[in-house]
UniProtKB/Swiss-Prot annotation:
Pfam families: Ribosomal_L21p. The lineage of its organism: Bacteria, Bacillati, Bacillota, Bacilli, Bacillales. This is Large ribosomal subunit protein bL21. PANTHER family: 50S RIBOSOMAL PROTEIN L21, LARGE RIBOSOMAL SUBUNIT PROTEIN BL21M. One of its GO terms (molecular function) is rRNA binding. Belongs to the bacterial ribosomal protein bL21 family. GO terms for biological process: translation. It comes from Staphylococcus aureus. The gene is rplU. Keywords: Ribonucleoprotein, Ribosomal protein, RNA-binding, rRNA-binding.
Length: 102
C-alpha cells in the first residue's frame, strides 16, 4: 500500500517503512507526526481525494532534524564593482513512515 501526501508545498509518494526527507517540521526527535493531507491511497483498493481522502492519515516517526548541504549564491553587476556572496543551508526533517490508515 502506498499514499501520496502533501507537506511543505510538495507532494510525496510514501510506503510503510520508507525513510523520507521533508521540509522542516516543528516536532522533536523521537516524536510521532500525523499527516492529514492525504491526496491518494493506492494498493488493493484505490482512493482518490477531492482534494484529500476523508479519514485517511499517515503516521511517521521523526528520526532527525538537520540542515542540508551548503549552497553558495553569488550575484554581481558587471562593470559596477558590485558583488555579493551568500551561503544557505536548508533545514529538513528525516521521517520513517510507520502506518498508512485509509
Amino acid at each position: 500500500m502506498f499514499a501520496i501526501i502533501e507537506t511543505g508545498g510538495k507532494q510525496i509518494k510514501v510506503e510503510e517503512g520508507q525513510e523520507i526527507f521533508v521540509e522542516k517540521l516543528d516536532v522533536n526527535e523521537g516524536d510521532t507526526f500525523t499527516f492529514d493531507k492525504v491526496l491518494f491511497v493506492g494498493g488493493d483498493s484505490v482512493k482518490v481525494g477531492a482534494p484529500t481522502v476523508e479519514g485517511a492519515t499517515v503516521t511517521a516517526t521523526v528520526n532527525k532534524q538537520g540542515r542540508g548541504k551548503k549552497i553558495t549564491v553569488f550575484t554581481y553587476k558587471r562593470r559596477k564593482n558590485s558583488x555579493r556572496k551568500k551561503g544557505h543551508r536548508q533545514p529538513y526533517t528525516k521521517l520513517t513512515i510507520d502506518k498508512i490508515n485509509a
